[in-house]
Regions:
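Transmembrane helix-boundary motif of multi-pass solute transporters/channels
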Residues: 12-48, 109
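Short amphipathic alpha-helical coupling elements at transmembrane boundaries
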Residues: 74-82, 89, 145, 181, ...
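Helix-loop-helix module between adjacent transmembrane segments
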Residues: 19-20, 43-139, 209-214
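Hydrophobic, membrane-embedded alpha-helices of multi-pass small-molecule transporters
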Residues: 9, 13-29, 130, 141, ...
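Hydrophobic alpha-helical segments and their helix-loop junctions in multi-pass secondary transporters
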Residues: 97-104, 108-125, 139, 152-192, ...
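Single conserved hydrophobic/aromatic residue that forms the stacking wall/gate
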Residues: 1-8
Length: 270
């Protein structure tokens, strides 16, 4: 899957790893939680994501490979100038540092509370150890290690999503067919909104928002695109983008379905 003598990885591995990058523990709360207020209309945005990935594969990836970029922000240097390059790269670093720090803080806090506190290890030591481990595996393995860990994260998150849905199904005393019928019968099983143009959930608004969100958050994001640039060729990178977009759609559908099932379970227990 990965050539460890270089920065080259297979497109299938990269696409799974990108799913892992897009998902997190926050996804388990935020996406199912949307169902209560907007039903399953978020799927309209997800469909826009898919077409956004196609545009990235057809427009941005050929450009990046043609210029043989290792950093997508160097394109700003070529087209606009050094100041735009530094500005784009600086905002990327700032956003990633803040986001990574918040996630790391949450993980370290949990480890400290449930594990290291019993060994009388201070919080500062836990932080230093965690940062050192992150630095060690990225420094020794580079982009290949990042892709492998993202892939493992994706598999674990999707597996846990399926397990949670199955546990909720059993809690509701349903078989698989009964679960599907429950989803279809729910008032929250509303995916498309075509009637009210003034609604923020109107299909056209959500669909095109999804396209532009994908272009900005994936196509112009170094963290995501460096994984595509690790593929052997442009064709492999495009295949990865198509696979990633295709896989991301059913995963979001499962998260929204979980939200419907949880709302149904909550109403039954009131």
């Amino acid at each position: 899957p990965c050539d460890w003598s270089s920065d080259v990885c297979s497109s299938d591995l990269v696409s799974i790893g990108m799913v892992g990058t897009s998902l997190s523990g926050v996804t388990f709360v935020s996406v199912p939680g949307m169902v209560r207020s907007i039903d399953m209309t978020y799927m309209q945005t997800v469909l826009g994501f898919f077409f956004g990935y196609i545009l990235i594969a057809k427009v941005l990836l050929p450009l990046y490979y043609k210029l043989q970029l290792t950093s997508i922000y160097s394109y700003l240097d070529d087209r606009i100038g050094q100041h735009s390059y530094k500005t784009g790269a600086s905002f990327f670093l700032l956003s990633k540092i803040v986001g990574a720090a918040a996630r790391l803080y949450l993980v370290v806090l949990i480890l400290q509370h449930y594990v290291f506190a019993y060994w009388n290890i201070s919080f500062a030591v836990t932080v230093v150890i965690s940062i050192f481990l992150v630095w060690l595996y990225t420094y020794r393995g580079g982009i290949k290690t990042i892709i492998w860990t993202d892939t493992l994260q994706a598999l674990c998150l999707v597996a846990m999503l399926i397990v949670i849905i199955w546990q909720v199904k059993d809690k509701m005393q349903l078989d698989f067919a009964g679960m599907v019928q429950t989803l279809q019968a729910s008032q929250h099983f509303r995916i498309f909104e075509f009637g009210d143009w003034h609604s923020t959930q109107h299909f056209m608004k959500q669909f095109f928002s999804g396209i532009f969100i994908t272009i900005v958050m994936t196509g112009l994001d170094q963290d995501m695109m460096q994984k595509n640039l690790s593929c052997k060729s442009l064709k492999d990178a495009q295949k990865n983008m198509y696979t990633y977009g295709f896989a991301f759609t059913p995963v979001n559908f499962l998260f929204l379905s979980l939200g419907v099932l949880l709302l149904t379970l909550a109403s039954q227990q009131q």
